Amino acid sequence: MWRTEDGGTSWSAVRGSPGGDDYQRIWIHPTDPNLILAVSDQGAVVSSNRGESWSNWYTQPTAAVYHVTTDNAFPYRVCSGQQDSGSICVASRSDDGEITFHDWHPANIQEYGIAAPDPRDPEVVFGSARRGVSRYDRRTGQTAQVGPDSAARGEKFGRNVRTMPLIWSPVNPNVLYYTSNVVWKSVDRAHTWTRISPDLARQTWTVPASAGRYASSVTPAPRGAITALSPSPKSGAVLWAGTDDGNIQVTTDGGATWKNVTPAAIKPWTRIFNIEAGHFDARTAYAAANTLRIDDMHPHFWRTHDDGRTWTEINHGIADNAVANSIREDPRVPGLLYAATDAQVWVSLDDGANWQSLRLNMPAISVRDIQVKDDSTCVCADLVAGTHGRGFWILDGLTPIRQLARSRGRAGTYVVTPQTAVRVRFGTNEPTPWPPELPAAQNPAAGAIIDYALAANAAGSVKLEIVDASGRLIRSYSSDDPVLDPDPALDPASYDRVCQKNPGAADCGLPLYWPAPQQRLATHAGLHRFRWDTRYQPIGDNPRTGEVEATGAVPHRSERTPVTPWAAPGRYTVRLTVEGKSYTQPLTLRLDPRVKTPPAGLRQLAALSREMYDLAAASHAAYLQARARVDSLSGAARAQVESLAPAAPARAPRALARPGQPAPATPPTLESASRAALAAAMAMQDADVAPTAAQVAACTRARAQVNAVLARWRRLEPPPRRSRRR
């Protein structure tokens, strides 16, 4: 950015970078020249002092990416080059409760390049672009140039454009493909390359009329390059290739021979943005043909089931106002397709015969690429989108869409089979959370996601229960559950009134933007989503006991954490009850894959946690029984019971115990013993590690305390009345 103060006689640079910021617009306030707004490929910046200093564009989610890929880390990272801001790999989940700059790293790929994380080592990211192939090692920060010809250019290397495909074989993790106008193959992680195709671009170079005055009378030279490549997940011998001048070619013998299978309706200069080889049939493929360069703004998606001999255009239902960019097949459900255009994302449940919008909460933006992330390492089923101007987006949990596709639009009341849940902690950033001014992206929900459908509005309450493999009830929710406190996210005025009357109420003193809206089981017709936090049932009258914790707090998403242990990894049953009828589905809960604690230590942790929880629950239940009997007693009997179960203070504690919270002084009561046992349990919940000697000792003390007060209660508790014989 340049400035002149003498009518253009001389100029001075006031803002820019060695790599070029690509400024597109500038605005100066008409009456206050101190105020300047500049916009570039990265975002907008503002100066209030005539350009002496500027705000930064990292406050805006304006990343313009060309492609999107994921690695095999946990949590998985989403990678791409981005326009004039370098490359990026960003975690799909953060341990800090929200995704911030701490969770991303550059990968030294050219801005328009394609990332190809090593499937066997997620710390290594290969990248493609016009200058070849790069290999970035996150551990060292070093980048090596490892393309087919990293020094020379010309016919030996071939022609290329900005976004050159670079992709690993889905059937052989040692095979890497790269393209120019020919296809290259490496079997040793880019140390050596072999050319496995001829020139796959068009051999006639007619310039379309849309070139207008830019057309030349000189006979055009060959210019096409490969812009789409898809190795088959069913056969290592099958590859599909598409070019930026409108060719689709396929090989079924590993590149020995290629066949041009371009649909007759695809015109020269059509850019094949991507091809998706079928996940269930090696003869199937889908293609996204982008016709922007020939002044055709309509979407064009294609499908073949016979090696490209015949093609069907599959656009019905897609808005006719944006070109095609990407198409993907769900790897779990045949015929379930996802498509991206220059405006939004679409979904088809019937192999492309019909499409419907899947935009949801995404902005209207050019979606350049989409990927279905579903494998054993991520323990997920997500749709990842890369946009040209709004960064990355992830649709978490494709299971409801998959069930609809399998049943072709299932009706009625049912529970969707949940995907495997991973027991992770939502946030571990202690003790001070990131301020709300820090740009951040949302974490996916922590816990088990449970989707259910109601055919009609429920006549009564709806109940959702989690049952373990032994049949024991672990957690229960009801649409009639009381609300803990007025919800500041939904009723701030009422929340303020409660806090004014009782400053000791839960979360009072916090700004209203911290707590998350409380979950409520929906009772109206439709498809609904609920989350089990993978903890045991809270102990006490209110099943939603809990407060916003400082650790892991996130603006607008801070959960009221139940003061109960984590449920152990294993098999569970989800049971939905509506109008007296129950619907069930199995649920598997897994440990965080990053945990390396030996099984014996994990078993000890689970056993002690459950034992302390059971002791706390038993002691609290006895306390409630004792309090129920107090009014019917008098004299010494009443005094003895009250010594075990004294009345709670006017303002009872919000929770029975917290990690590290000391038990009240002796003599112990039923409630203090319950608090001691729960405190011992909660002290072990911060990490999936074997209990320490101190924690085991605390459990031993709590066990003895609970057993002692329960024994005293049993001696005082009158036997149940027996009915008289008549």
Task: Give residue ranges: language-model regions.
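Beta-propeller blade termini and top-face loops
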Residues: M1-L438, A445-A448, P482, P486-Q500
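Low-complexity, Pro/Ser/Thr- and charge-rich linker/hinge segments at domain boundaries
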Residues: T399-F426, T584-A618
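Glycine-centered tight-turn motifs at strand-turn-strand junctions
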Residues: L473-P565
